[in-house]
């Protein structure tokens, strides 16, 4: 266990799905006394209340620093914005430039993320003389999971292990994880601080400030509205392909991922230095065929046995039924959500294009003593319960009753 000390965490990207969980968990894991300060850097200004993070005097949130800027300018802005930044001992790099922000240009997407990482690690190296550890979070594209041209040429060897060779060129030309890890390794030469890379696959979670970003939000809203319109016991079809329905993978909740990153950087900093680690809720592969029926039952629905071999256009159905959605929100006092095309696009991609088995091997992180484990698919129900409390979907007791359809038919 980590002793009480003067450790200070800096979370870059503190309101994203990963950074939010890291900032929250750093206040209590491995213990409440581990960090005397938890500093979150955000792209946009938000209050603690708006972020949904705990109201803890150790938590500090700052914005107004664009990591896409010139390194020298970023150094000046960080020093200006964050009091006593020199106290920082642990940096968690969870910032990310989206493909949509780069107008779908894959090369620009790669270059922007590499440049941000370069700026972040070198700025922290300059400003934080007490820095002990730097965590880089990447993902399973380190194995080519979302490199679709590559997947047409090869079959992934599962379970995916950290020792797997890199995706070869030209398929890896637009992947930025390798360049991120390489530049941190280079920056670390001759320095006292340590670093590691953490690789999750599908992250099942949300943040109060960005509900619509992860695909679990459009899924939950679609199923809630489908139940409202069609009534209890209605059969609902899996929206993706047959291959996607049956392929195996290992997802992770943000809290598990955050605690793993804290564990590696605090408890096993020597052993994890310079290494990459897979992380998931469990090493038991969980295909959609093991999750979809129980997810449907949560919403008072039954999973249809019919599965098409293409996207079922649930986004089109959603937009066509906005009148019913507004009625459902009014009836149950829900907070109306606006689903962006990006949210639906991410869901469509995950349910149609990724159609190979891709489960992760967790032997490496388990070997260092991080053994947190959760049942297959349980992360979805945790998110659904959060959505109920946030009044994004009707309560489960309502979904389990026949009243939704009766209300609609009376209107």
Curated annotation (Swiss-Prot):
Database matches in SUPFAM superfamilies: NAD(P)-binding Rossmann-fold domains
Gene Ontology BP annotations: terpenoid biosynthetic process
Pathway terms, separated by semicolons: Secondary metabolite biosynthesis; terpenoid biosynthesis
Keyword Signal: no
Keyword annotations of the record: NADP, Oxidoreductase
Entry EC no(s): 1.1.1.-
Enzyme class: oxidoreductase
GO molecular function, one term: oxidoreductase activity
Similarity comment text for this entry: Belongs to the short-chain dehydrogenases/reductases (SDR) family.
Function description: Short chain dehydrogenase; part of the gene cluster that mediates the biosynthesis of calidodehydroaustin, a fungal meroterpenoid. The first step of the pathway is the synthesis of 3,5-dimethylorsellinic acid by the polyketide synthase ausA. 3,5-dimethylorsellinic acid is then prenylated by the polyprenyl transferase ausN. Further epoxidation by the FAD-dependent monooxygenase ausM and cyclization by the probable terpene cyclase ausL lead to the formation of protoaustinoid A.
Note: In A.calidoustus, the austinoid gene cluster lies on a contiguous DNA region, while clusters from E.nidulans and P.brasilianum are split in their respective genomes. Genetic rearrangements provoked variability among the clusters and E.nidulans produces the least number of austionoid derivatives with the end products austinol and dehydroaustinol, while P.brasilianum can produce until acetoxydehydroaustin, and A.calidoustus produces the highest number of identified derivatives.
Name this protein carries in UniProt: Short chain dehydrogenase ausT
Organism listed in the record: Aspergillus calidoustus
